[in-house]
UniProtKB/Swiss-Prot annotation:
Keyword DNA repair tagged: yes
Domain notes for this protein: Has three domains with a flexible linker between the domains II and III and assumes an 'L' shape. Domain III is highly mobile and contacts RuvB.
Subcellular localization: Cytoplasm
The entry's keywords: Cytoplasm, DNA damage, DNA recombination, DNA repair, DNA-binding
Major localisation: cytoplasm
Higher taxonomy: Bacteria, Pseudomonadati, Pseudomonadota, Gammaproteobacteria, Alteromonadales
GO MF assignments: ATP binding; four-way junction DNA binding; four-way junction helicase activity
One BP term from GO: DNA recombination
Gene Ontology annotations for the cellular component aspect, listed alphabetically: cytoplasm; Holliday junction helicase complex; Holliday junction resolvase complex
Keyword DNA repair: yes
Annotated region (Domain I), positions in chain: 1-64
Name of the featured protein: Holliday junction branch migration complex subunit RuvA
Length: 211
């Protein structure tokens, strides 16, 4: 079991990253909430992982902290919820936001997540209620290795990097991989895009606009 990786962040192609540890590059799929917390490329990053072995593939899912990984592991125990849908849930809301939805039976917020229909949302509320009854609100302040919090890092990246239209394309592709339809992804990105935005910021704002 691979539980944690620490190494140089080589690539970010949301929702996938490539992290090099001791000369080995690991492809890891992450929820957008975790990708927002990553440092710049060529910087050291630490991610917590969940390893899945299937007949046709070996897959690594990564998270910025143990809390997100814990919720991911609870989600994939729900009947009909696989890793892809669990990642979509965590990409659209934080762990505590999801827990709040469950505790308040807020089905309207959950059905807005791509891939979650009414029946799946109802099943999530029912099955997760008992599993989350002892969940404590998590006050997590993620800090990168250079002491910069994710919000500051995103702002600095937006100011310092020269952006091209590829960022819009990357954002659209990321939304498609999360289960949104082409029309939804195009419309959401177009509605939030401003010149100079990083792909991560475009994705984050686009997701907010659809919830």
């Amino acid at each position: 079991m691979i539980g944690r990786l620490r190494g140089m962040l080589v690539e970010k192609n949301s929702p996938e990253i490539l992290i090099e540890c001791a000369g080995v590059g690991y492809e890891v799929t992450m929820p957008m909430t975790s990708i927002y917390a990553l440092p710049e490329l060529e910087q050291q990053a630490t991610i917590y992982t969940h390893f899945v072995v299937r007949e046709d593939a070996q897959l690594l899912y990564g998270f910025a902290n143990k809390v997100e990984r814990k919720l991911f592991r609870l989600l994939i125990k729900v009947n009909g919820v696989g890793p892809k849908l669990a990642l979509a849930i965590l990409s659209n809301m934080s762990a505590d936001q999801f827990v709040s939805c469950v505790r308040h039976d807020d089905i309207s917020a959950i059905v807005k997540i791509p891939g979650v229909g009414k029946k799946t949302a109802e099943r999530l509320l029912i099955e997760m209620r008992d599993r989350l009854k002892d969940w404590q609100a998590q006050q997590i302040h993620l800090v990168s290795d250079d002491g910069v919090i994710p919000e500051q890092l995103s702002a600095e990246l937006s100011q310092e990097t020269t952006f091209v239209n590829d960022n819009k394309g990357d954002a659209i592709n990321a939304l498609l991989s999360l289960g949104y339809k082409q029309v939804q992804a195009d419309k959401a990105v177009k509605s939030v895009y401003n010149r100079g935005m990083s792909s991560e910021n475009i994705i984050r704002d686009a997701l907010k606009s659809m919830i």
